[in-house]
């Protein structure tokens, strides 16, 4: 029986509480006092602010809230900050209430949208609240991880529903809420329902705290010896986490039997990248690494090993994600300060408690441990003093090591203050956008009154409210000037005194607001141009969010190459530095796109919320004929390869969905096939997750993740594999054109074509010709011949050089090993000859 089968005939609060607590008892769950108190408030119809520690069963209270809403024939919404958590909760609630009663809205996907229980992101709920307001069919809202209300970029989405859905019962939940009296009063005033705050500092697994002045390796060794593992070591940069993992390889973490168990669980898992090969060494030693820059499949493997109790230490960052299920007994802080993008500062109490709260696993541990590590210079000074012993003379002679220049100090007092401090109050992040005005204007009724209430009755200070009002007036005027909004002489049948002149459903996209601009910009391109397909890629890339790490790496590379060239040209230092300021990352079609964007914005003012950003990541990778590994190595992005992959997956989805089928040329289809297959071979989980969100009835999130680790043969997608082969061959042409025989020799040494062989072959070519073409014609299909020899599992390939005379009598001959390609997830090309036909 599912939970929904326990719904009582009578929606009386007592009957509801008895029914739900009875179901919990059948599941072997004993309610904590805070859970009981919270559920009593929920079934009575009150708003609830639930602030209890991590692992104290907030999810059970949320289930009780949905149960109550269903009993009262209400639509209930559950919101979470990330799509992955929304998806996870969707499947959890399907088990409790049945698939027919649960739906999901993420912006990417809409599943069973008319169900009485809806899981969605905060932004989706905010969009509904702006569009429908008090008329929205929403009787209850459960907002998980409510501390995101204070997030600078996204916090507005947690505030809007509170302002615009007075008909709803609200359940706000987080482990780190701080003073919520303002919200308590505000919710009661707006909804007319009493608001209860349920707090509990009592953790199911109590925490103990300790500040250490020993060296980190000594601290860690003691924690391992006293069975306080697994230990999560908190770092404040991804690089520091990886460096720590490498440094800890000298400590013997596991027994031989434990290492065998790790190897067995890893099985045939494929570590395909440079970082992956390092991670393989770490995890086999009992050390995990976990941060946002990793490939999802590597993070999943670390989580899987941790859940099996096989990792003794996990080196990670302070951004241990929401919904990440990593069991931890001890949290060890390497520092109590962090760089926040502007300055180095002491951790905030909320940040500290959010991480410290992960220590101790309910149902597994009887206690959790939080350790604060003293700064390195303090540790060294303590060590020197200990060596001096009790001899006053020796102690006076100790030369104390000073803190590094610019060091923001912390100490035991800092640690104790953070432990004792409550999380800071949540600050409002309200903002006004074109989207907000368009949504409010589109709803029935007087839009001016609705906007005035929204702008003057929110959680902002009066000073900020006036700033938002000025912004709203400016946006409204731009909408009128652009012909998007018109004033009506008389109210229409639904009470509107202003109306939209465009169809929002056609011209406005929640997830890809610039997709309509991309469609318009395609008309500016020349279909006959040899660069047409790549120009379409550049249009779509300009509408995507900037992957800052990639763009910074591209700029650094471009500046390094520019400096080398200027030095070779004898340019003086001062002039070099001046010229260097103009060197940026590649921005194809920049002038054309910005001109088109300016014109488009006049008739579509709302795109002003989303600035255009020309860039070349997909195009750069394709033009250089690089594999994923070659690209991350070339730009030194191995530590952030997860960010690279996320951008590639996002670009693939945008290219596949934004470009109409009638505009997709053969070359463009090749690029999409190549990109999709490359992403899948590196880590298919991002695309699988997207497809699974769109078709959740096919498989669960767990099944999709399991399938993601089962890599399909790269040769299965024939079109994509041909592009991979073509790129592998043309990569050699590009390197040959630059006379980079060392790289070619490194690439082909195993097939007998080392640096000397390549050098001799290219010397012979340069004796005959002074150029080697690498333009669009040089990589065209006319200069590549593929002969498929399926019987022997080989493709025989000939890449002809584009020589300046058009003789086309030089080239590269190679064999492609299909079985080896499937094994390695890439085109395995073995050069057999370089020379004249």
Task: Please provide the spans of the model-predicted regions.
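Conserved interdomain hinge at the start of the Helicase C-terminal
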Residues: 212-236, 243, 300-308
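Conserved segment of the helicase C-terminal RecA-like domain
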Residues: 330-333, 337-339, 345-386
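Compact beta-sheet-dominated globular domain cores
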Residues: 802-837
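Helicase-associated low-complexity/disordered flanking segments
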Residues: 1-40, 44-48, 255-284
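Conserved P-loop/Walker A NTP-binding site and adjacent catalytic elements of P-loop NTPases
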Residues: 21-23, 29-205, 212, 230-235, ...
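Conserved C-terminal RecA-like helicase domain
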Residues: 77-79, 87, 94-103, 238-313, ...
